[in-house]
Amino acid sequence: MELGKGKLLRSGLNALYQAIHPVHGLAWTDGRQVVLTALHHNNEEPKFGNSIVVGQFEHVHGLYWGPFLGNDTPALLAVQHKKHVTVWQLCYSSLDKNKLVVSQTCEIGDPFPVLPQGCTWHPSKDILVVLTKRDVSVLYAVRYENTSIKADVKSSGLIHCACWTKDGSRLVVAIGSALHSYIWDSKQKSLNACAFCPVFDIGGYICAIESTVDSQVAVSTELPLDRICALNAGIAFDVPASSEITISSQPGLLLMEEEFSMDVVQKSADSGSLTTDSLATSPATLDLTHIVNHSKADLNSLLNMKKKDYLTGSGQDSSHLILVNFEKKVTTTRRVSIPGILVPDILAFDPTAHIVAVASNTCSAVLVYSLTSSSVPNIQQILLEKNERPKGLCFLTDKMLLVLVGRQKTSDPAFLPSSSSDKYLIRLMVKEVMFDEDSSASSGGNTSVQASFDSSMSIQDKKKLVESLYKEGQSAHREILLPGGVAPPTYLRKKKLIEEIRSYDGDQSPTSSANEFDDKRSKLRVESLDTEPKNRSITLGLDMDKKPNSRPTSPKSECQKSSPPNFIKHGEMSPQQEILSISRNVERLCCNFAHLQQHLSELTDITRNGKRPLSASYLPCRQAPYVTVVCQDAYHPEGPAMKRSILLCDNKLRLGTIQELFGLSLIEMQLGPSLWIILTGDSEGFIPLTFLANQEITIRDARISTTHPPLSMDRNNSLQPSSSVT
């Protein structure tokens, strides 16, 4: 179902969270309007009915239905804006059953913006939690007043998301990498920190949280990018010891060295415990986290790629889905790696089939996991188009998943987004959940392998099983190992995990990327390897060889291949030549900056006027409009003055042009017989005045005229205009 154009948040949003009401249907927004769409489904294909607009605001970031308490109780709808949340009551008129009556019941505001997933309702009571990055507010009387209380958040970190447990006894707030647990006291109307485990660290930055069954929650953690996106390539990879380095006699090849390790990582936080029990790696996969960083002299040497399994990974090399139980003591019951999704900020759970859907606002894939097995297998992958992003997930039934899809316009990756929201073409899509065991084989490895790694197996049994699988899979084709030790699904094997913004110089060939490896070969060729980052900045005559710059150049360098910069050699040039070269380079940079300002000015005109200025409106050269600028000597106004003719631009003058022409930083212009004004510039650099063609204006140095008046003249006389002024 197509919903049209809409403006939604870029990240951290699940637009279908608490968005379906059994009576009023689906609540959705295009960024301004609140729309209700009828939804009919009885374990069959869902059917969407008519849509009505019940409200319109300046900004709408999210809609959340309150708990369904019966047909006789009016429904509550929370509308999330930028820095406040309004709660509305909806019911049908007693006189006209088809007339919907909407009225506001309460409102809460905060100095900080509301988080993208900033509201969550109690599962069985009219209690609304509103989240900002610093505060957790609880509105417990939303039908009558704005009364609220705030939780005592003792952490200095930033709040990201929160949810109530399914039984409604506990509010779990995600702050950084820790879960803060609060107990709701309905009599005292207060949130109290959990007595036995108020804070539980799970070892990864939390992206999303969703209640599952009873007092259990599902948590997704993001891939820590600081491990793979470091400034120095040596920081981005784990380098093995020197004794493990093997050099091949054939240059240009990569050797694969098989090595398996088995570790059990246990981590405790407060009174809770965290036991990591990850999945097995699929056979014959390559671990790219052990590339040896050779020196520049060893460019012809070979790189060693270690073979490693992640039966019990540390949780620092992948995004994860974690199940946390809050019954008697906090325990992490299950943990699974999420392949191919860096920031899994969308979670949806179905209590009937015990399945979890995981997605990201920045990735076009949706993964479905089953919680019935201790291995938490991936049973289905849903792949959207390249320019489509999931903006919301929810289960209609145990076999139907509703996906809100946002299609983006193709944008230039060289420009980073400047706002937290973006425009999308929105549509609703229903996907059937497949429970076929064969469908889970492509989830990143052998399903039987994953199901075999039950927590009841001993470490020795696991090691024997992995070794046997490895021996059987030696002849199989090799694949690139995704972070977390899980092989990529079929739809991700030939795609990049991270799309990098690269700009290559004319003398540098791009380094081979992960998707260029042929998975049918056991020996992989690398076109070019350079372990030391090259300095791509424009040389200004400084000794920058000692400190290379690894930052990428701007796209403008792509156009300068024909004229590479002249690198200065200190031993061949005199100091005067070096200074001259530096000044020329500085002038070139200033010129480029001036062109950039001009382009920005054109973009501003396009944004304001909706069209590009036409060059056809330019006048012929013989009819060039210009003004004559007379620069008066402040000490001798009656003496000779400098005159320059300057071309007008739409009857406007650039202040910077006059400043550069006469060497003045602060300029005064004569406006009347006894009035001088100091000139300023607007956002585009123009003097905020219009001039006529062939007009003559008089200016002078404002600093000298105001601070040092001429001694031989009367102050009033110094303000008299020159006789040459017309």
Swiss-Prot record:
Residues 506-515, 550-565 have a biased composition (Polar residues). Residues 581-609 form a coiled coil. Residues 503-571 are annotated as: Disordered. WD repeats lie at residues 55-98, 154-194. Residues 517-535 have a biased composition (Basic and acidic residues). Keywords: Coiled coil, Repeat, WD repeat. InterPro entries: WDCP. This is WD repeat and coiled-coil-containing protein.
